[in-house]
């Protein structure tokens, strides 16, 4: 079992044998900690055994592995799939994982419970502390925006506060080291906007030092381009409750612990700080997206308005408006909200409005557990309530692509994942007045309950379902979803394509682009880019093309229109290619990820290395980045700098991405591909597992996040494609 830093310094830990992950047919994930007596009669799933490093995990021992002289790509593919199927939860069909990386999620859970006077259960408290301690920077003891970031004020102050609220004393070596780093960076005064908001709610900062978030903007006509109903869904999801908190200037009652914290996180006494002069103070290490002059002027005008012009009528009207919007968010998502950041802010507002014993607040407490995920390092709040739909859609597709899906040993794996996707389709519309588009028929990123349509997830789910429905092997489950339900999904997907004046032919994430991209000049977050409005994303457009072309091949529904929509999407993909042949990826790292999706999309319309200059440029770029050992490796710095940066060593996931791209493009130099395939085979464990190497995902250019299933899914696909193209060997 791995020894972590928390173990070396003697921090308490729970018994990993007593944890059980519960899932249901809608994909909800929640952890329980049992008594030894309960655990004896409740065996863990193989996923739980693997994740928590239980020696009783049924480790596979395939006959042929990398030490066998005749070990083929298909052998490696089959071994990887045989291992991966053990990570599927039998009750739900999902492939659970700890979708972690961001270091600013857990503060909401801990702060809301502290403010509400709710004691976090001891087993959770212990593991929340362990996770934060185990993700501290190994040199200076601070924390960053994400788990592989340098130490920042934002990450360090929030996680320091969490540790103190959870009971770690200020003189504990972990706290002392982190506090030293925080003060060296200038103290909490340099925290970005979201940090200042949480500190103000905890009475550790003053609201006059927080840039405003006026709820009155929701009273403006929707026809105005700046109306917040036109913003990106995550941004408006956060700033609806934040605008309420900003309006009422909520700070929790002072306690002795908070008094201590006030004295620990600043470089000078709290009472001597002029907070109003520090609205724009952000530590240079934190600052990814500086304020525009436009935003600074707007903030100054709003501060003047709030101080001298806001009247009680407007105050009450705007307060009611945003709380009504919070209630629609809770209704549309059964209190999950779009993600944990806005869920925690919504919970705090609900606590203020309705009280700790209210049904609404208690439901939010229940739903907090959906994103609270345990792992070997400890427990953390994930980036969302999971990646259930995304991973299931890929698993089905890639098992088919690899020639595995119809083999008897994978029948249950495919059926279970397919059943989950059938259950995960949205079958209701949002509450009127939610500023939400039609969603019935679509799929989201995680679960049906979460309820937010995502374009590429809808497309990939449709493609996966059609693959199963086309196979006679799975005839017993074909009835679970009708063609008419797929048509509803296609209707939503087509409605998400940008065919107006914004980025013609592209697909964004959750909605069409509804406001000019120039709105980004009002980005207040300081640590993220591209958050104000929807943006066109090449990989979302690629996935949408994959779903539409596959559907178009087998159905006549809206056939001519779909043909046109595919054509204009392909035009956008080509237009998005950079002069060096690359595409910038926004949801995976980075140029390698986007290149894979782009070249697969172009393959679906018949474009290959031989007949397409776009494909040739894309392949030549990827080949130029191959490392000496035959693999590929790209750093998170690529996402931040918008320029390709090699990682320290080649990586399995990115090698698979590059190989998939080259195989779809029919790249003619087989030796290049062979070297990459050899790396995937050699990095595989004898059991079929690939070990974690580096973070795979990213969002908003600056925040890394892990996709643990990627190290199985994409190598399986790459090896399977290679085997079908070049090998006659069968298992």
From Swiss-Prot:
Listed pathway(s): Terpene metabolism; lanosterol biosynthesis; lanosterol from farnesyl diphosphate: step 3/3
pH curve summary: Optimum pH is 7.
Known role: Lanosterol synthase; part of the third module of ergosterol biosynthesis pathway that includes the late steps of the pathway. ERG7 catalyzes the cyclization of (S)-2,3 oxidosqualene to lanosterol, a reaction that forms the sterol core. The third module or late pathway involves the ergosterol synthesis itself through consecutive reactions that mainly occur in the endoplasmic reticulum (ER) membrane. Firstly, the squalene synthase ERG9 catalyzes the condensation of 2 farnesyl pyrophosphate moieties to form squalene, which is the precursor of all steroids.
Alphabetical list of Gene3D superfamilies matching this protein: 1.50.10.20
Enzyme class, first EC level, given as a word: isomerase
Description of how activity is regulated: Catalytic activity requires the presence of ERG27.
GO CC terms in record: endoplasmic reticulum membrane; lipid droplet
Note: Present with 2193 molecules/cell in log phase SD medium.
Keywords: Acetylation, Endoplasmic reticulum, Isomerase, Lipid biosynthesis, Lipid droplet, Lipid metabolism, Membrane, Repeat, Steroid biosynthesis, Steroid metabolism, Sterol biosynthesis, Sterol metabolism
Species this chain originates from: Saccharomyces cerevisiae (strain ATCC 204508 / S288c) (Baker's yeast)
One GO biological process term: ergosterol biosynthetic process
Short name of any one Pfam family annotated for the protein: SQHop_cyclase_N
InterPro entries, per database record: SQ_cyclase_C, SQ_cyclase_N, Squalene_cyclase, Terpene_synthase_CS, Terpenoid_cyclase/PrenylTrfase
Thermal dependence of activity, per record: Optimum temperature is 35 degrees Celsius.
Lineage top rank: taxon: Eukaryota
E.C. no: 5.4.99.7
UniProt GO MF annotations: lanosterol synthase activity
Membrane topology: Peripheral membrane protein
Name assigned to this protein: Lanosterol synthase ERG7
